[in-house]
């Protein structure tokens, strides 16, 4: 039977269940555990919280893709997850200046995820501690602003490979560490810069993801100041190379027979929308250009809503 993935917690997906053996005891406890525990020599548990009868665990690990730096992620597992039953997963990508904690603490996802018995994985937004000159000089470049690309410009290319970190390294780590998540049944969503990353990964790697949703995403980064700055900083070919990480460009070049499931929500009171940094309408225009069924590209604009996490909560 074909599984239709629940994306942004509203597109339903038939599911199987599963859970990390190390979490079984924590699932029965409401307390936060802050002592570190090493799991199979690769993952270290930094903390655990019970939430909606499931467990939110913060892990740290050494990332080969990010140049050997320590990386962190949060993983929510619903109550039904256990060693014998794996659950499908949503990857949530956060925006500029965020960490792995922002959406986990403010996104309001867990009640719906628990109801649907879905795992959610929250990666970080960039490497941390690379100590590259200029890395901390700007809020929209460097630390907290990895832009979900694989950098090709030195010295960034040693560390700033968030595309492979999310797409390859984290799913491989989940599988190797026997966290009870079925990585073959995955969808992806995100906010702002993370919405950009989610759209790009879905459009480039549809074999990995069933659907994509994005809140206030940067949809056409080669045509906005934020995207141009990041592409010129990370990519040897600058904006021209950035086209491979531009959702509108990717959509415009898809085969007309390609089946997509794209949902975008954006507030009309979002200052970034007003400044033409987001350009969600470009996705529909790109779909028309490629001949794709644009009914499967939903762009919903909401009067009065802004760029904040409260707007994300409204769309759930």
Range-by-range predicted roles:
Residues 8-23, 30-58:
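N-terminal targeting or regulatory segments adjacent to alpha/beta-hydrolase or S9 domains
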Residues 25-27, 32, 84, 223:
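Local alpha-helix boundary/kink/capping signal
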